């Protein structure tokens, strides 16, 4: 594109690279500007936001945040830069909304990396943030901006493993659906709790405990095994590369287990695709009167964010930029996100 606009000028490509990798322009403000257009073109009253982490292949040791994570681009562990994305999972299209680099702990805490941070232009203050925490922070900008209609937030098991990370989503007035490990525990019915009687010696107890003889919590896998066949229904959950993917699903209200204690009442949704048979379980804070058909339909709305990343790599050259610094990652990512939205909107015409 540069050669087409500027001709075979010796400095044209280099100038373009410097503008993208080192230019002092506001990438965050530019990323947020199309959100109103996203809502106008693709928005829904009960929109779904998705959060996901991925890594891009990156060689060398000098690039900011480079490590050997599980790099999805090559399907193995390789030098790469990890990031967290937020997307809009509309039924008409799924554009990117936000993406931020995730710094490994050693890049933040190890003094040996201080000079690398300085050379890479990493902005202070620098703190260690897990991918779920970083994703939730970027997610909060969407409802606060007030330009996108959204009701749901979908996340993978990395998000659902720690329920305390889900609470801020509920505080934003959003309903979450996050996959959870199979060993996640809960109660079919809320167990009775009481403050133990004081025996007259030692410190007097003040905190309630689950009373003796109350039902013990069960893993979500064990709970799902007890569901009768009539509780399962079939849903079309997403579009695959070879056609629609259909899965059987069932939903049940359970009492979540929080640090050993009975927590809030939530939906437990079990999904079983017909082709693979791989079982997935997710936790939802949706109201108790939410129709099962809605839960089944939305259970497949997490994957579009993964499609965004694949589209970026295969169609837009995401990951081919040679920049090493902080801006050299943020700026190209911003342009890829804008280009991806134009690609999604163009497919509607």
Name each model feature, range by range.
Residues 1-154, 158-178, 182-185, 199-214:
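Conserved, well-structured functional cores that handle cations and Mg-NTP chemistry
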Residues 9, 79, 159-162, 169, ...:
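Active-site-proximal structural scaffolding
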Residues 55, 159, 208-213, 290-323:
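Short amphipathic alpha-helical "interface-anchor" segments enriched in bulky aromatics
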Residues 92-120, 124, 128, 181, ...:
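An anionic, glycine-rich sequence signature occurring as long contiguous blocks
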Residues 286, 299-303, 325-329, 333:
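A short glycine-/small-residue-rich loop at the edge of a beta-strand within enzyme catalytic domains
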Residues 311, 316-349:
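Basic, amphipathic alpha-helical segments enriched in Lys/Arg and hydrophobic/aromatic residues
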């Amino acid at each position: 594109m540069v050669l087409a606009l500027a001709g075979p000028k010796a400095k044209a490509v280099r100038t373009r690279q410097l503008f993208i990798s080192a230019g002092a322009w506001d990438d965050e403000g530019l990323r947020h500007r199309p959100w109103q257009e996203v809502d106008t073109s693709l928005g829904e009253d009960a929109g779904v936001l998705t959060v996901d982490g991925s890594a891009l292949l990156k060689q060398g040791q000098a690039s900011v945040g480079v490590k050997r994570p599980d790099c999805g681009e090559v399907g193995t562990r390789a030098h790469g830069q990890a990031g967290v994305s937020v997307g809009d999972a509309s039924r008409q299209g799924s554009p990117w909304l936000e993406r931020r680099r995730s710094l490994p702990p050693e890049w933040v805490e190890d003094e040996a990396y201080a000079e690398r941070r300085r050379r890479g232009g990493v902005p202070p203050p620098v703190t260690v943030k897990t991918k779920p925490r970083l994703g939730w922070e970027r997610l909060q900008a969407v409802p606060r901006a007030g330009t996108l209609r959204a009701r749901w937030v979908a996340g993978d098991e990395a998000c659902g493993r720690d329920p305390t990370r889900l609470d801020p989503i509920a505080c934003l007035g959003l309903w979450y659906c996050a996959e959870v490990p199979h060993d996640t525990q809960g109660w079919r019915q809320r167990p009775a709790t009481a403050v133990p009687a004081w025996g007259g010696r030692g410190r007097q107890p003040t905190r309630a405990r689950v009373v003796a003889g109350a039902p013990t919590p069960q893993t979500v896998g064990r709970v799902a095994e007890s569901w009768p066949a009539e509780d399962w229904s079939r849903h079309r959950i997403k579009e695959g590369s070879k056609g629609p993917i259909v899965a059987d699903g069932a939903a049940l209200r359970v009492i979540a287990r929080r640090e050993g204690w009975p927590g809030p009442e939530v939906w437990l949704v079990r999904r079983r695709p017909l082709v693979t048979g791989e079982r997935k379980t997710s936790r939802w804070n949706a109201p108790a009167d939410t129709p099962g058909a809605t839960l089944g339909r939305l259970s497949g709305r997490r994957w579009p964010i993964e499609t965004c990343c694949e589209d970026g790599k295969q169609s837009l050259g995401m990951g081919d930029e040679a920049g090493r610094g902080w801006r050299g990652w943020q700026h190209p990512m911003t342009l890829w996100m804008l280009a991806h939205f134009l690609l999604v909107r163009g497919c509607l015409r």
